[in-house]
Design a protein with these regions (language model features):
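A short, N-terminal "cap"/entry segment at the start of jelly-roll beta-barrel domains
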Residues: 41-117, 217-306, 312, 388, ...
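Glycine- and acidic-residue-biased ligand/ion/polar-headgroup-sensing regions
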Residues: 135-154, 316-337
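Short acidic-glycine-tyrosine-enriched beta hairpin
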Residues: 154-170, 337-355
């Protein structure tokens, strides 16, 4: 059974056996966040919430409960067992090196996310993420500071660019690249890979390549004396300190100037672009292969929801959604087939997951703007709006299904708003 078929099986048949088949870490996290709902009868649940039935005189982690009120005591509309929908970067260990750190949320931590893995990385000013390449595409969003990125095309042409908060880059699979923190305080960024099981240890590092090649072969290949490579690192560098580089123009000249310049643009100014959709409730900025041609396998949206606003009810027919919460507080309900639904809470630095075709909304439950990223292992961003569907069907059909008459139907927004 391939990955897509296994995911579809989990969604369509969210059985106890599927749930118990997940890793022990995921099960612990799921229990920790209250992400598995027991079947509830709405009337019984509503009555229980008003009497002594929901009291908990025993032990509790109040700080955690305060962050996850809907995860612990879900609304009565929740029902059944579902796949894990939540994790947090604050629960995973940091790999700390001189020059920065990294940590990851992958399929191991969030087993339902088979298509995407995420990393959060920090580089101090001048420090490098070692020159490397890997088997997955790398899509990144800058959360803080500034960085310089380089990537070489297979034809030998080079792209060099500087990025800052709100910008992104894409490195295609197999293309060698590097990242360096700039002044005054380096950078922090989110990395998204289109392989759910991708690992920070699964990259091909320049230092390791050189260390594992016979010196005489390196000499023959490069034309350098074999003794030159005696000073090469014997251990992986991965993240290591360096000196803040000079100007971007100087680096471009140093590598060969226009003669070796890439025809392709690998960076994009996402936060500063005009919103794709905007309303009183917030905005959505979409980036995919249509406006960023280099990003052929990863699409994304930067969503801002005002207090009390709502990322409208919708679903994605072409890909599962991997979310990263940058700021604010939110709750999300995800609807699954066979009468299953689950509501979970999110805070900054959390990760959310929604299987393809699962209906959901994201509501701002805080008093500041909610800011998050939606990412997809796809070339295009595609979503289906519930409101738009309800307005497009004949009024008699809507009346027959939901008892909404024609006059009431006219009050539903006719166009896809993105945020309400």
């Amino acid at each position: 059974m391939n990955e897509r078929a296994r995911e579809r099986s989990m969604i369509e048949h969210p059985s106890r056996r599927n749930f118990l088949g997940m890793s022990s870490l995921a099960l612990a996290t799921t229990a920790f966040a209250g992400l598995t709902a027991n079947a509830q009868e709405r009337a019984s649940t509503q009555k229980a919430e008003q009497d002594h039935s929901s009291s908990d005189p025993g032990q509790e982690n109040k700080a955690l409960l305060d962050l996850n009120p809907n995860s612990n005591t879900p609304p009565p509309t929740d029902h059944g067992d579902v796949v894990p929908l939540w994790y947090s970067f604050d629960l995973v260990k940091k790999r700390v090196e001189e020059g920065g750190w990294t940590h990851q949320v992958t399929e191991r931590e969030l087993p339902s996310s088979r298509d995407i893995a995420g990393f959060n990385m920090r580089l101090t000013a001048g420090s490098y993420r070692e020159m490397h390449w890997h088997t997955a595409d790398e899509w990144a969003y800058v959360l803080y500071g500034k960085a310089r990125v380089t990537v070489m095309n297979p034809d030998g042409t080079m792209f060099l660019g500087d990025v800052e908060e709100g910008d992104l880059w894409i490195f295609p699979a197999g293309f060698p690249h590097s990242i360096q923190g700039l002044g005054p305080d380096g950078t922090e960024f989110l990395l998204v890979f289109n392989q759910g099981a991708f690992s920070e240890d699964g990259t091909m590092l320049l230092s390791e390549l050189v260390a594992h090649m016979p010196p005489e072969v390196l000499s023959k290949n490069t034309g350098l004396d074999a003794s030159v490579f005696a000073n090469a690192p014997k251990a992986p560098l991965y993240i290591f300190p360096g000196t803040v580089p000079g100007s971007l123009a100087a680096d471009k000249t140093d590598v060969g100037g226009e003669q070796v310049a890439s025809r392709y643009q690998y960076t994009f100014h996402l936060k500063s672009m005009e919103p794709t959709k905007t309303s009183k409730g917030g905005s959505v900025r979409i980036v995919d292969s249509r406006n960023f041609p280099a990003s052929k396998h990863i699409a994304a949206a930067l969503v801002i929801v005002k207090p009390a606003g709502l990322r409208e009810l919708h679903w994605h027919p072409n890909a599962s959604e991997w979310q990263f919460y940058i700021a604010g507080k939110a709750r999300m309900t995800v609807f699954f087939p066979v009468d299953n639904a689950r509501t979970v809470d999110f805070n900054a630095n959390d990760v959310g997951y929604v299987p393809s075709n699962a209906g959901h909304y994201i509501e701002n439950t805080g008093d500041t703007d909610l800011v998050f990223l939606e990412t997809f292992a796809s070339d295009e961003f595609v979503d289906v709006s519930l409101n738009q569907w309800l307005r497009r069907v004949p009024s008699e059909m809507l009346q027959a299904h939901l008892n909404i008459n024609r006059e009431q139907a006219q009050m539903i927004p006719a166009e896809k708003l993105g945020v309400i």
